[in-house]
Amino acid sequence: MDNKEIIQEVIKAFDNSDVETILRHVTDDIVWEMRDDKGMVVRGKENLLNFFSEYNEMKMVGTTKDHIIVDVDQVAVDGIVKMKGKDAVPFEMYYCDIYELKEGKISKMISYVNKKL
């Protein structure tokens, strides 16, 4: 599986809330930086699992993938994500995710998100 295929599988797993598949594709020392108004950073596979458990009330409704750009061990994806929060009110966000891979696993994710007005 090449890096683009790995990221496409991970994106599909995010779309389907398939945490097991996501965790299978990340390193034990994964770092996920969310560069939004909260500025959250998740470090390590165990903390990533805890993050997904904590935010399980957020449901993915749909996404677009406008671009998938691959440069050796870095992959960038952008588009629009449609979600429902714990209040069940739908909302949309623009996103750009940058993935860094080492030996076929994601070692770092940087997510830029901005709520669509």
What are the roles of these predicted feature ranges?
Residues 2, 15, 33, 39, ...:
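A beta-strand edge to alpha-helix "cap/lid" segment located at domain peripheries
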Residues 6-13:
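Solvent-exposed, amphipathic alpha-helical segments
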Residues 16-33:
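Short, well-ordered alpha-helical segments enriched in acidic and aromatic residues
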Residues 26, 38-39:
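Outer-membrane beta-barrel domain signature
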Residues 42:
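Short aromatic/basic micro-patch
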